[in-house]
Curated annotation (Swiss-Prot):
Cysteine pairs bridged by disulfides in the record: none
GO CC annotations on file: cytoplasm
Name of protein: Ribosomal RNA small subunit methyltransferase H
GO terms, molecular function: rRNA (cytosine-N4-)-methyltransferase activity
Amino acid sequence: MMENYKHTTVLLDEAVNGLNIRPDGTYIDGTFGRGGHSRLILSQLGEEGRLLAIDRDPQAIAVAKTIDDPRFSIIHGPFSALGEYVAERDLIGKIDGILLDLGVSSPQLDDAERGFSFMRDGPLDMRMDPTRGQSAAEWLQTAEEADIAWVLKTYGEERFAKRIARAIVERNREQPMTRTKELAEVVAAATPVKDKFKHPATRTFQAVRIWVNSELEEIEQALKSSLNVLAPGGRLSIISFHSLEDRIVKRFMRENSRGPQVPAGLPMTEEQLKKLGGRQLRALGKLMPGEEEVAENPRARSSVLRIAERTNA
């Protein structure tokens, strides 16, 4: 049961400090989870402050609904739609900070019934919102071998992607897989060289989860929307847990922290340069967890926090 989980929020203070909270500000926690970041943000807001939280996991929504605070509201949906949520509330350009804690949460991993983990046998599901879309089992049973291989290679950086994809398709022809343990066993058997520090199914489970939940597309859309909804001086505080996520965040902040790229020697008037606009973000750097936090919470090891500020451009 979800109430039994003790969830340790990674980079809790650092991520919230990165928002540079104003007591009367309006903030978004795009990944409510079990509410660690939201509760800390609320503790720093005054009576006029406001926090809008988002999550697509029904279990997270159930936890959020226990917060009885007039400054707080929760939306059940993907954070990629934050632009729509903000527009509906007439808050475009008025958001003082957005926090995103990307990837799968510890409660999701630890609950066998959610199907995210190869360490616990459960239904082969992996959906952040189990009420929407295809489960991992449904997708693996209907996808072409080449498509599965592409997903494993692209989202899991799995070097044995083709071999594993073939084994998955062959197994599903014999008897459709419906359990996480079955997929983990098929992947392990199809992996010719084992990494002694990592379970052979690690990359496959990551890849399938990312694909089923459109995770990278969700991140890209949310980042794009953030430029429209943030007020000048508003902050982005984003925690990523693997290189694919961090690459997207790093590239977005870098590209939007530069001014317009005009080829050298190209004649342009001041009016034309104004239309191109200036830089929209100021990157404020990155933070990683210290040794003490990693010792207390090993899952924090790969996390990276990146912070940026919306400019007046």
